Structure formats: structure tokens, C-alpha cells
């Protein structure tokens, strides 16, 4: 029953949150140290634990066939712990990907910018990783000792990509019921080309 499913998810989420009250700080500290030790210069590492209302809304999503997108939400939603790494230049992204690949088990790696280009659209660049903390991860990063087996999501962006994403979200897509005009779309497309060139 859907109610039992959501009740179970609520118990799982709140039990985990109570057991790991410093999760956001633990992951931020561990990843900052990881990048520093690897010699990667970064702007910032930000972390957040997904709120219960946000998790509940995601767990209720259904596909076109009416089935739940996440039948087992606690096991299938991987951004309860979310990490964002902001780098100064795009050339550092492959280095960061290598460091994460060596330090965690990589469940999924997606280049969002490449996906957008392949589909013929436009959008900000961002690389998304789904990672799992292993015994080796915890041995190297003592802050993560309590999270062995835990899966989390990492977004890697440059400072420019991050600024673009925030700007586009606030100006282009938060327009209420009125869609942006063709002039606005053309302006954003031109700005995107300019920002891509600058990031290279």
C-alpha cells in the first residue's frame, strides 16, 4: 500500500537523520580534505541532507505508465546526501573525477553537458556522480567511518557553470505561468555560447 510505503520511508529517513546528525559536515570535511590532498584547487564544497518534504515528493513521482519511478525509494533515491564541488576551471574536472573514482565506488557517472549537446539542446554544464562509501573510503577518510555502504550524489561544476545555472534557474524558468519570450530564449542561447567559450 502507498501509505505503508511512505510510512516506512519516513521511518528510514528519520532514523538515519537522527543517527547521523553531522552528516553534512562529515561529508564536506572529508571531501575538502580529499581534494586538498590531491592538489586540486577548488572554490568550495557544499553539502546538504535532503529534507523530508523534498524526499517525500520525489518518492511520490510516477512514470508515464503510472508506476512509481522509485518503487523502493530509500534504496533508489541517491541524493539524500548531496555534495556540490565548484572548481575554478573546466580543466580540473577530469582530475576531480579521477580522485572520486579512486576514493569511492562509482555507481554512475553522467556528463550532463554532453547529454544536452547530444539531444540538440542547450544548458549549463555539470558532471553528476553517484558514489558509494567503501571500507577503503572510510579507512582513508575517518569522517566517513559511519557511512560505509552509503550511496550519495556529487555534482561537479566550474564557478562559471554554477553561476550560469543559478542565473538561468532564477530568470529563465521561474516565470510563473508565463513562459519566457523568444527574445529571452535567444538571449540566453547567446550567453550560453559566450560562457562555454570563457570556461574553455
Predicted feature descriptions by range:
Residues 1-80, 87, 91:
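Charge-rich, low-complexity segments
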Residues 46-51, 110-128:
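Short, glycine/charge-rich beta-strand/loop segments that flank catalytic centers
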Residues 61-71, 105-116, 127, 133-141:
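Short acidic (Asp/Glu) patches
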Residues 92-97:
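Short, conserved charged micro-motifs
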Residues 101-108, 175:
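A common structural junction motif
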Residues 119-168:
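Internal, well-ordered alpha/beta segment that forms a basic, Gly-enriched binding/recognition surface
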Residues 150-159, 165-192:
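Flexible glycine-rich active-site/ligand-binding loops centered on an Asp-His dyad
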Residues 193-200:
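Conserved small/polar residues in nucleotide/adenosyl-binding loops
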Amino acid at each position: 500500500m502507498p501509505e505503508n510505503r511512505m510510512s516506512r520511508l519516513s521511518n528510514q529517513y528519520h532514523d538515519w537523520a537522527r543517527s547521523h546528525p553531522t552528516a553534512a559536515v562529515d561529508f564536506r570535511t572529508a571531501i575538502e580534505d580529499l581534494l586538498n590532498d590531491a592538489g586540486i584547487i577548488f572554490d568550495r564544497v557544499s553539502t546538504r541532507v535532503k529534507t523530508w518534504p523534498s524526499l517525500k515528493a520525489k518518492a511520490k513521482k510516477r512514470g508515464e505508465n503510472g508506476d512509481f519511478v522509485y518503487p523502493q525509494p530509500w534504496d533508489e533515491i541517491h541524493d539524500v546526501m548531496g555534495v556540490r564541488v565548484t572548481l575554478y576551471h573546466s580543466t580540473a574536472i577530469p582530475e576531480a573525477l579521477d580522485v572520486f573514482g579512486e576514493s569511492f565506488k562509482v555507481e554512475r557517472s553522467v556528463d550532463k553537458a554532453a547529454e544536452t549537446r547530444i539531444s540538440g539542446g542547450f544548458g549549463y554544464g555539470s558532471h553528476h556522480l553517484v558514489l558509494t562509501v567503501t571500507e577503503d573510503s572510510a579507512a582513508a577518510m575517518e569522517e566517513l567511518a559511519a557511512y560505509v555502504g552509503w550511496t550519495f550524489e556529487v555534482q561537479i561544476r566550474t564557478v562559471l557553470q554554477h553561476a550560469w545555472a543559478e542565473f538561468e534557474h532564477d530568470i529563465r524558468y521561474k516565470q510563473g505561468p508565463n513562459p519566457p519570450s523568444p527574445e529571452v530564449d535567444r538571449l540566453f542561447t547567446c550567453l550560453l555560447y559566450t560562457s562555454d567559450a570563457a570556461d574553455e
